[in-house]
């Protein structure tokens, strides 16, 4: 889903009040990326629609949470501590591209977000629309 579509912004300068900070963030996204991890701050996602951006955000946040859980469960001193530390496993480029084409499209992102939207609409009675 995030293959060749994710950047890391290492120097987040706080709330974007100045045009320069906004430009730096845009530069890190580049011409094609829709997802940005801002170190020591959080996530930023974009999309052609609100649904696409929201679905990317939800998926990226869940991926980050999973990564943190794995790393904390294998850290020294934890029950699942690994002797050789946690080793990265990279997905083959061909597999990653195939996965992105099936899960990272605007249509797929809409289909992933729509159930979340319907749940929020039901739980709030639509109050957020006012």
Q: Predicted segment positions?
A:
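Short HxH-centered metal-ligating active-site micro-motif
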Residues: 19-34, 41
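Class I SAM-dependent methyltransferase SAM-binding "motif I" and its flanking Rossmann-like core
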Residues: 1-17, 21
């Amino acid at each position: 889903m995030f293959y060749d579509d994710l950047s890391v912004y290492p120097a987040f300068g706080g709330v974007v009040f100045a045009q320069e900070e906004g430009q730096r963030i845009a530069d890190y996204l580049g011409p094609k990326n829709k997802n940005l991890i801002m170190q020591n701050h959080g996530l930023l996602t974009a999309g052609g629609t609100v649904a696409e951006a929201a679905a990317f955000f939800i998926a990226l946040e869940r991926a980050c949470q999973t990564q943190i859980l794995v790393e904390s469960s294998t850290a020294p001193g934890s029950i699942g501590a690994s002797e050789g530390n946690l080793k990265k496993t990279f997905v083959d480029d061909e597999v990653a591209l195939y996965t992105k084409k099936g899960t990272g499209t605007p249509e797929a992102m809409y289909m992933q977000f729509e159930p979340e939207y319907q749940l929020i609409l039901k739980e709030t009675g639509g109050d957020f629309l006012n």
